[in-house]
Structures are given as C-alpha cells and as structure tokens.
Amino acid sequence: MTILNMKDLDLQGKRVLIREDLNVPVSDGVVTSDARLRASLPTIKLALEKGAAVMVMSHLGRPTEGEFNAEFSMQPVVDYLTKALDCPVRLAADYLDGIEVAVGEVVVFENVRFNLGEKKNDEALAKKMAALCDVYVMDAFGTAHRAQASTHGVGLHAPIACAGPLLAGELEALGKALDNPARPMVAIVGGSKVSTKLTVLESLSTKVDQLVVGGGIANTFVAAAGHKVGKSLYEADLIEEAQRLVANAQSRGGDIPVPTDVVVAGEFSPTATATLKDVSDVSDTDMIFDIGPDSAEALAEIIKNAGTVVWNGPVGVFEFDQFGEGTKRIAQAIAESNAFSIAGGGDTLAAVDKYGIADKVSYISTGGGAFLEFLEGKELPAVAMLESRGQ
C-alpha cells in the first residue's frame, strides 16, 4: 500500500487542508463527547509544528445539504479547539472562492454539508476545495467509506494528497489484525441484527479461527440450533443462513458457539427483573437480553488463548446493568489478554468506556461504518484515492 503520510512531508509555509472527523454530539452549543476531537489534535498540532497554514474541515450531523443551519454549525468545535490548541482558531463560512490563512493559524471551515454537492462528490465543488491548498490531508477514517467531495474528490485534484497520522495509524492497526494476524484469531460480532452484519460474518468466518456472536445476532443462532428464543429479537428468515455459517466454520475445524445459559426477562426496560436460565429452558414469553455466566466464562477462555481479538458489538443489553455482565466479562477478558486487540463501533466503544478498559485495548477504531466495511474486506473509497495519488 503506497500512501503518502503527512508526517513525512515538508509543510513549511504550505497551505494544508485537513479533513478530520469532527462529527461530535453538541447540546446547547457545547460539545458533549470530545473523543473524536481529542483524536484529531495530534494531526493539527503536527501541521502547526511543521510551519503550515492550517485549514480543517468536517461534517457535523445531518443538515439539509446546501443550506446553512445554525444547529449544525462548527462553532462549538471551534470553541473547543481554541482552548485545546492554545492558538488562534477561527470559523470560516465563505471560503470556497479563496481564503487567506497565515502560517501558525488554524481556520475551521463551516460544516461541509452546507455545500451543495458534498455527498454526491460533485467535481466542481471538489476542485474548489482542492484549489485552496498545497497539501490535502485525509485523516477521517470514520468517513473513509464514503466517496464525497471533502473525503474523496478533493484528494483527486489537490496538488498533493496524503493520509494524516490518525488515518495511517488506523490502517496500520487494522492491517496488522486482518492481513497477518497472530493466531489464533478471534472475532466477536455483536449487535441486534444478523442482516446488517451478514457480510461481516461471512468475511470474518473465512479469516478467523473462532467467530463469536452476541446480542440479537446470537438469538438467531440460538434459534438455528433448535432452541426456543421466546419473544427475543431474532430473524427467522436468516436461520438457514446462520446454520450455513456454522456448518462452514465446522468444516474448517472451527465453530460458532451458541450460549449454553442466558439471562432473560419478560419486558425490555431498565427495571426489568433478570432471570438466569439454561438455553434449553427459555419459555415462549421470555426475551433473551444477555449471555449467562457459564457462556461468558467459556468466551473469556477463548479470548485468553487468542493471539488477535477483533471486537465489534456487545453480547447483551449492557446499557441496563442487570443485562451487562456478559459484555463486562468479555471486556475484562480482552483487558487481561495478551492478544493484539481492536475494538470498533459505537456501542462497543461505549462498553469500552463503561468498563474502563480503553488503556488495555491495543487499538480503538474511530470508525463505525468504515470499520465494518474494512472488516468486510471492502475497498474504502478514500483509501483507494490516497493509494492512486501515492503512486
């Protein structure tokens, strides 16, 4: 993979345009979760240290394209960066026809989705963005799976297009986990639906030594094994698909283990009473919300012996503590394991935070959809663009 890296370039006196993923939650004009902003700081600081005039752009939320909407303004991000960078940071609303930026200054462009043509990767818009810079830096792994004007088109037309340290680090870590993994390799795929993760399950099942399913996905596999799932969330039309995945895994000497014990309740609520049952004892009125302690220990043992662990999705409704023990045990096992571990996806990162294991995970991926598409083996448009420009 030949991709230029920003850290290897001479940026002295250069106009550097960085595409970050600064799509953070904002409430009453204040950023409420700054994880993505913190992740972007080293790249912005490095560009400043290298003597660049720095421009930063991102989307924020889902405004109607082509229309200004104060609710989705980048102003709260600018306020945050002003404090975090300890240097002048200004917001620019009108920049497409040219903007003056001084060396040592940071200018944040207003929400890129206020520009008509952003999502469609409009060539005229991309060329205007490209004309603003000497070097374009793609550093937003979270949007690398989208071919849009600010993530893809601009890079085709900029004088130089390179990856930022955050994106480069992400690709390196994911490559290490998927291209040449330390064995045995274990993938834990949770979440509510098999249908949304089917291609991920198929792709991973051919790469890993052990595939583990959790959450609503596991319920479909429980049903596929011939057990009742009561009123649990599951997909009856994908039972044959689940059986095929299990058969494929077994034909390669692996398996997709089904929980032996589960935690059930009669309703989905934070006050629901949790009851532990053997998987064969689930009644018609039960809803499965977590794996039981025996199943959790069996998975912890698999993780303990792994060389590589990829974690995408919780194994239970961990938002409610009485259904969080399974996910908590998985998190602890990953934290205690010597394996190279990667965690990605919004719910997974919330679990990593809740159980305080962030510093024990080898790599935490900033991408949601991009992380999944990488696991599926799909080519990410922004990465393909950087490769074509790196030749």
UniProtKB/Swiss-Prot annotation:
ATP binds at residues 197, 319, 345-348. It is found in: Cytoplasm. It catalyses: (2R)-3-phosphoglycerate + ATP = (2R)-3-phospho-glyceroyl phosphate + ADP. Its EC number is 2.7.2.3. It is an enzyme of class 2 (transferase). One of its GO terms (biological process) is gluconeogenesis. It comes from the Bacteria. One of its GO terms (cellular component) is cytosol. Pfam families: PGK. GO terms for molecular function: ADP binding; ATP binding; phosphoglycerate kinase activity. PROSITE patterns: PGLYCERATE_KINASE. Substrate binds at residues 21-23, 36, 59-62, 113, 146. Keywords: ATP-binding, Cytoplasm, Glycolysis, Kinase, Nucleotide-binding, Transferase. Pathway: Carbohydrate degradation; glycolysis; pyruvate from D-glyceraldehyde 3-phosphate: step 2/5. Monomer. Belongs to the phosphoglycerate kinase family. This is Phosphoglycerate kinase. It comes from Shewanella pealeana (strain ATCC 700345 / ANG-SQ1).
